[in-house]
């Protein structure tokens, strides 16, 4: 999907890691939503409260998911699924700016 039509964009940003990771919520007419984010180069650790599909629109990163012990290379456009894991984290290492959205 190259664009979202007929949506509401919540102005308030979710800001993490001293401003190096930020996101905005995109609300659709049917009540669903997505999160559109920007991640600057760096290393980050995230937990998930629900299953998430992450679509990397551009950029290059390495990820390590909780059920894995190896790094996986992701180059946008590409997606991956992060299962619910409140007690475990997944890790990112970015070498270039990344645009992504969560479904």
From Swiss-Prot:
Keywords annotated in UniProt: Glycosyltransferase, Transferase
Any one GO cellular component localisation term in the record: cytosol
Keyword Glycosyltransferase set for record: yes
UniProt catalytic activity: a purine D-ribonucleoside + phosphate = a purine nucleobase + alpha-D-ribose 1-phosphate; adenosine + phosphate = alpha-D-ribose 1-phosphate + adenine; cytidine + phosphate = cytosine + alpha-D-ribose 1-phosphate; guanosine + phosphate = alpha-D-ribose 1-phosphate + guanine
Coiled coil: none
Keyword Coiled coil belongs to the record: no
EC number, UniProt record: 2.4.2.1, 2.4.2.2
UniProt-recorded name of the protein: Pyrimidine/purine nucleoside phosphorylase
Function: Catalyzes the phosphorolysis of diverse nucleosides, yielding D-ribose 1-phosphate and the respective free bases. Can use uridine, adenosine, guanosine, cytidine, thymidine, inosine and xanthosine as substrates. Also catalyzes the reverse reactions.
SUPFAM superfamilies (UniProt xref): RmlC-like cupins (SSF51182)
Top enzyme class: transferase
Family in the record: Belongs to the nucleoside phosphorylase PpnP family.
Domain of life: Bacteria
An annotated Gene Ontology molecular function: uridine phosphorylase activity
């Amino acid at each position: 999907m190259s664009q979202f039509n007929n949506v509401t964009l919540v102005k308030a940003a979710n800001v993490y890691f001293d401003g190096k990771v930020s996101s905005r919520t995109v609300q659709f007419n049917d009540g669903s939503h997505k999160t559109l984010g920007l991640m600057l180069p760096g290393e980050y650790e995230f937990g998930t409260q629900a299953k998430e599909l992450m679509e990397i629109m551009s950029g290059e990163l390495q990820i390590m998911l909780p059920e894995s012990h190896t790094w996986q290379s992701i180059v946008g456009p590409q997606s991956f699924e992060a299962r619910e894991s409140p007690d475990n984290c997944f890790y990112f290492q970015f070498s270039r700016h990344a645009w992504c959205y969560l479904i």
